[in-house]
Amino acid sequence: MDVKNKMVAESMSFYYDDYQALKNISIAFPENQVTALIGPSGCGKSTFLRCLNRMNDLVPKTRMSGRIMLGDLNIYNPKIDVVDLRKKIGMVFQKPNPFPKSIYDNIAYAPRIHGLVRTRQETDALVEDSLHKAGLWNEVKDRLNDLGTALSGGQQQRLCIARAIAMQPDVLLMDEPASALDPIATQKIEDLVLELKKRFTIIIVTHNMQQASRASDYTAFFYLGELIEFGKTDQIFTKPREKQTEDYITGRFG
């Protein structure tokens, strides 16, 4: 079966002032698959993830070379509208960050602003659909007017996922989305990731090796700003080609 790539980084380097945080990264992310980015703290994986929707544009004295393509679109083309780009590439952060609004408005706010919904009926349908996809609807359907911040940590994170997918992105980026959650909530997030890949291409940063092996199709190992190895998750975890990869996933360093 031919693999279609949704997003591709080509010879990408990234600098904080004079410090080179990422060194000549080339990687392709298959469509409707989950790719896990692993590596020790400070290896560049979260910096790389933020490059994929230009979040690092907000950081002073940074620069990037190379290309990142979303389909035929070079996302660093100066003519690109970054707000429009981030509609195509959603982001879920490590710490749940619901808006201080109702559960309903957490989902409806951005689609209203961007004109994705025009009537109350359309908005209701989008809110319900997004909460269903995030596995949260049955838990909150009778209290949509409650504050999103009143939910449990795991529910807040699924609300943030629902908020991201309400914008109907092509790609969903997740930066350690379960690291602040208990094991039960973590399992729900992992199950959700496997369900969501039917509709979205997912790129997830994780420090949890078991999570990477359970919830991803492909794995990329970063070390000191370099992409050391990339391949199917089964191969990376059972027969890694590089000794550094093997040492990391077996706990010898990192």
Swiss-Prot record:
InterPro entries: AAA+_ATPase, ABC_transporter-like_ATP-bd, ABC_transporter-like_CS, P-loop_NTPase, PstB-like
Protein name listed in UniProt: Phosphate import ATP-binding protein PstB
Native organism: Chlorobium chlorochromatii (strain CaD3)
Keyword set, alphabetical order: ATP-binding, Cell inner membrane, Cell membrane, Membrane, Nucleotide-binding, Phosphate transport, Translocase, Transport
Catalytic reactions on record: phosphate(out) + ATP + H2O = ADP + 2 phosphate(in) + H(+)
Pfam families in the record: ABC_tran
Subunit structure: The complex is composed of two ATP-binding proteins (PstB), two transmembrane proteins (PstC and PstA) and a solute-binding protein (PstS).
Gene: pstB
EC numbers for this chain: 7.3.2.1
Primary site of residence: membrane
Described function: Part of the ABC transporter complex PstSACB involved in phosphate import. Responsible for energy coupling to the transport system.
Membership in a protein family: Belongs to the ABC transporter superfamily. Phosphate importer (TC 3.A.1.7) family.
Domain ABC transporter: 7-249
Compartment annotation: Cell inner membrane
Gene Ontology molecular function: ATP binding; ATP hydrolysis activity; ATPase-coupled phosphate ion transmembrane transporter activity
Top-level enzyme category: translocase
